[in-house]
A protein has these predicted regions:
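Bacterial Sec-dependent N-terminal signal peptides
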Residues: 1-23
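Cysteine-dependent hydrolase recognition
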Residues: 21-250
Length: 250
């Protein structure tokens, strides 16, 4: 029993060392705050456009939100999830993350009950078609996964099965987003950099939201106009300028 316990401790320590080795750089916040934010980026993207990413970090901290930059040679999504949970348990507590560049994508099996319209026979169709790509892998800590394998053609796709011990509903501990390029080769770095510069510029503008376009899929709430009334009122309450300008469209 004691030997098994020692082996378990050793394996956990070994995983920690491996994960730590894949993190090539951590840039800590320059300000203090009640919560924090983190930018996760692959090392190649950071080496190409580090100046713009640092400026993006600066623009976030100008809004009084402490910001980390975590750079790594990511091998598994688990590495990133582990680091996110560690930041969440630290002070100031992590409130959100953004993934920039080539960040691994978790392709989840046995998770179709979390989706609204994705229904496919997992036994009949190949993994790449019948798995659910989801960043809930990173931002919902009550979901538990078992690693299956890596995709044979797309180096960013990693397959996991959702374990029965997972929560039956989605309740994210943090928010997350991706800045993922659509172009290939060197052009993808230029595309990310262009977007970051646009975000930095917009953050400096004083431009209150006065027009709001709302849309939904065909058949949503059975196309009932009455069902939309409360939603419209909530948008007017959340975005008062739209009411003044008659700027809500749906």
């Amino acid at each position: 029993m004691f030997k098994k316990f020692c082996l378990l401790i050793f394996l956990c320590f070994l995983n920690f060392i491996i994960y730590a080795q894949n993190i090539t750089q951590i840039i800590k916040p320059k300000i203090n705050g009640h919560t924090s934010f983190a930018i996760f980026v692959d090392d190649k993207t950071f080496s190409k456009i580090s100046e713009s990413i640092l400026e993006y970090k600066k623009s976030i901290e100008e809004k009084k939100l402490p910001c980390y930059i975590i750079v790594g040679k990511w091998v598994l999504p688990d590495e990133i999830r582990s680091e996110i949970i560690k930041l969440y348990n630290n002070k100031p507590k992590l409130e959100g993350v953004v993934f920039i560049g080539d960040i691994p994508i978790a392709m989840i099996r046995e998770a179709q009950h979390y989706t609204s319209a994705f229904k496919m026979d997992q036994k009949k169709f190949p993994f790449i078609r019948s798995s659910v790509p989801s960043d809930r892998f990173y931002d919902d800590f009550d979901l538990h996964f078992k690693f299956l394998n890596k995709d044979s053609t797309d180096e960013l796709l990693y397959y996991y099965t959702l374990l029965p011990s997972s929560s039956p509903i989605i309740e994210k501990e943090i928010y997350s987003a991706r800045i993922k390029p659509t172009l290939k080769g060197e052009e993808k770095y230029q595309q990310i950099e262009k977007f970051l510069k646009k975000v930095i510029r917009i953050k400096k503008e004083k431009n209150p939201l006065d027009k709001f376009l709302y849309g939904c899929a065909e058949g949503y709430v059975s196309n009932s106009h009455d069902a939309f009334i409360s939603e419209v009122l909530s948008y007017f309450e959340s975005f008062p300028k739209t009411k003044e300008q008659n700027g809500l469209f749906y």
